[in-house]
C-alpha cells in the first residue's frame, strides 16, 4: 500500500494541532530546564520519592533526558501515525494524541525537577 503524502498528513487539522502543541510543549520544557537548571559542578536532584525523599542525584545535563525522551516520543508517534494514516486515520490521531498527553506529563515532571532544585 502506498504511503500517504506527508504534506497532506501534516495539513490534517487534528494532526497539525497535536503535533504542533506537542512540539511547543517540548520546546517550552527545553527552555525552562536550561534556564532553571544551569551547568554546575554540584549534583542536582533528579528523583524524589515520598517515602525516602531524594533518591537519585546526578549531573545537571541528566535533567535533559526528559525533553529528549519527549522529542523521541513525538518523532516516533508522528512517523508511525504517518505510516498508518492511509489505513486508519483514527489510530494515527490516537498516536498523535498520546504524544500530546506524554508531553503534558513530561512538562509536569520538569516542573517537579525545577521546584526540587531551586
Task: Describe each PLM feature range.
Residues 108-118:
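Juxtamembrane boundary at the C-terminal end of a transmembrane helix
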Residues 81-104:
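Cytoplasmic juxtamembrane regions at transmembrane-helix boundaries
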Residues 34-45:
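Membrane-helix interface motif
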Residues 51-71:
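Interfacial helix-start motif at the membrane-water boundary
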Residues 1-11:
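Short, Lys/Arg-rich, polar N-terminal cytosolic tail immediately upstream
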Residues 9-24, 93-98:
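Alpha-helical transmembrane segments and their helix-start/interface "positive-inside/aromatic belt" motifs
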Residues 18-31, 104-106:
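Hydrophobic alpha-helical membrane-insertion segments
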Residues 2, 71-87:
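Transmembrane alpha-helical segments of integral membrane proteins
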